[in-house]
């Protein structure tokens, strides 16, 4: 059975530093999505994006940023922060043409009848487009869909399962295998 992603469990499990845990989760999902099997080089305090940009199979140079916001944070209040990250990445990383923002929240739909996206989201995307950077979003629904895939089940358990049984079982299985192989 594939249990749903429980964001409250994530908050509980990583209550000491949920932002760092979310950055780690976003890194794993980004590497998976763009087939970066061995990870992506990064610097300590990497500016504007989480790692060096990745070259994709379809010819793009993509960077990502993870943004973990507490429940009281309005996405509209983060517009300038996101624009600053876009501008900084454009200036720092030659050739970058796409930035993916992993966010633990969903945008609120526009209150206008003829629009789905809120104005602040449209302004952020337009700002990126004017700099030659496509902006993509990976919100809760995207993350939950990715973590529903069988091959990412271990990631979901690592970040969203407060029971330590699976982690201990996996560790004991590896130790058992190593002890057997050690004597061969």
Question: What is the role of each PLM region?
Answer:
Residues 1-184:
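Mixed-charge (Asp/Glu-Lys/Arg
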